[in-house]
Structures are given as C-alpha cells and as structure tokens.
Design a protein with these regions (language model features):
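Membrane-associated alpha-helix detector
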Residues: 10-12, 191
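Membrane-proximal, non-transmembrane alpha-helical segments
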Residues: 128-180
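Generic structural signal for short, solvent-exposed loop/turn connectors between secondary structure elements
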Residues: 88-102, 128-135, 157-167, 203-209, ...
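Compositionally biased, intrinsically disordered low-complexity regions enriched in proline and serine
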Residues: 9-10, 208
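A generic structural micro-environment signature
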Residues: 21, 123, 149, 153, ...
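Soluble non-transmembrane domains of integral membrane proteins
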Residues: 12-151
Length: 268
C-alpha cells in the first residue's frame, strides 16, 4: 500500500502533464495590430496510416476588417499544399457574409510501420489576401492541437510577411501510447520466456496433457494482445519485429512439441 499510493499519484501527475501539453495554444504573429484577422486553427484528426492530418480553421476579422459577425472586405484564404475537405483550391469569404469554418487536409511524411516510435511531419502554409485591390492582410494564427494518443510539436517559420504564416508540424505517439506499447512487448516476452521454459521441461520428459490446449490458446491470444495496443497499425510494424513475431514463433514451436509429446504419451 505504501508503494501503491506514490505510484498512483505519479500516474495522475503524468496524465495531468500530458493533458496540459495537448491543450497548449501556440500563437504565431503579432496580436498588437488592430486591423488584422485572427485564425483559430485546430487539429481535428490525425491518420498516420493514410498519412493525413485534418485542420479546421475559424476566421475572425478584427478592427476595420470586422463587420458584425462577418468581414467588411472580401477575403481570400490561400493554403498551398492542402486539400479542402469539400474540394480543391482557395477559399473566398465574401464581404458581409457569415464566415464559416474551413476544413483542410494535409499530407504527412512518415512511416506508420515504425510504431510506436513513428514520426510524421508536415509543413502548413497559410496566407490571407484582400480582394479589390489584391493585397495581403496581416493575421494572427492561434494553433491548437489536442488529439488523444499523439504528441504534437510546432515550429514556426520566421521571417515571413505579415500576410503569410508557416509552421512545421511534427506528430509522434504520446508518452502514454509508447509506454503502453512497451508494456505490451514486455508481457509478450514474459510469455515467451515462460513458454521456452516449458519447452525445455517437455524435451526432458516432463508432460502435462493440458499443454496443447494452453499453447493453442496463447497462439491466438497473442493476436488479441497485439491488436489491443493503442493505435497499432496492421501487422508488420517495428514493435512486431521486436516482440510479437518472436513470441508467436516460440509459442508455435511449443505447440508442435506439445502435440508430439501428446502422441508419444497417448494410451495404447
């Protein structure tokens, strides 16, 4: 009990720290400019298997650019490298029209098969122009990232004009996911070592009639354990080569040895 209480407290502290990190808000730009556009960018979803990340933008004009809940000027949002969820191309916000959120889909570079140590990255570039006449509009980017199971890092690109914002996005598995995956691999190897010990006993003549059933259950149970790891991709990941495939082979070998031992000890 004396060890359980500190461990429980540390676990809650780790959750709180990870939760606060996920709720972090990154400010890119100068919010002291009165006539500007505030862009609230939130990462809605991340899909390492598809290599895609979905970003939702909410546009809020300020100062002379604001007219109630709309814009006093026609604004054009440029997002090179991104695909709109409802099509391709730029987004135009007509003056005195209700401003609606915009969903953008970005391609991410990375290998999901490196799970749980996979790293994915993308460059996000946004620009806002005013039409009639065409000119850039200064804007501030509020970037929020809170996707369970992932740790999100942002590195703003400096030295750009006030109407252009760019950021390098880096996505990794959260500490909770990495620790859970490592714990699963440790459990697999514990099972594998135990099965190796049983193989050694069977080879020296020890036999138990329940062994074939035990190894057959473990053979299929390992698949369930492997697939229950958080966010695990299909089979063939780095974690599989570290633990699952090895232990699966050990259990399969043990099942063969147990079947041979059963045939050897069968009643006449």
């Amino acid at each position: 009990m004396m060890l359980f209480i500190p461990a429980y407290y540390l676990a809650l502290g780790a959750y709180q720290a990870e939760s606060e990190d996920q709720r972090s808000i990154f400010l890119i730009g100068d919010e002291n400019q009165s006539d500007r556009v505030d862009v609230d960018a939130r990462i809605v979803s991340l899909d390492p298997l598809q290599g895609e990340g979905k970003l939702r933008l909410v546009i809020q004009p300020q100062g002379n650019l604001r007219h109630g809940f709309s814009s006093s000027k026609t604004l054009k949002l440029l997002s090179p490298g991104a695909v709109k969820a409802n099509g391709l191309g730029e987004t135009v916000f007509e003056r005195d029209r209700m401003l609606t959120p915009v969903d953008l889909i970005y391609s991410m570079d990375g290998q999901a098969s490196d799970y749980p140590f996979d790293v994915h990255s993308a460059m996000i570039v946004l620009a806002i122009n005013q039409t009639g006449p065409e000119r850039s509009v200064p804007f501030v980017l509020w970037f929020k990232g809170n996707v369970p199971g992932f740790a999100i890092g942002l590195q703003p690109i400096e030295g750009l004009p006030s109407g252009i914002r760019a950021v390098n996005l880096t996505v990794t598995r959260s500490a909770t996911v990495v620790n859970a995956a490592l714990a699963g691999m440790v459990v697999m190897w514990a099972i594998g070592i135990g099965v190796l010990a049983l193989i050694g006993l069977m080879l020296t003549g020890w036999y138990n009639i329940r062994m074939p059933a035990l190894f057959a259950a473990l053979l299929f149970g390992l698949f369930s354990l492997r697939n229950s790891l958080p966010g695990t991709p299909p089979i063939g990941t780095y974690s599989d080569f570290l633990a699952f495939l090895w232990v699966q082979g050990i259990v399969a070998l043990a099942l063969i040895v147990a079947v041979v031992a059963t045939l050897k000890h069968r009643p006449l």
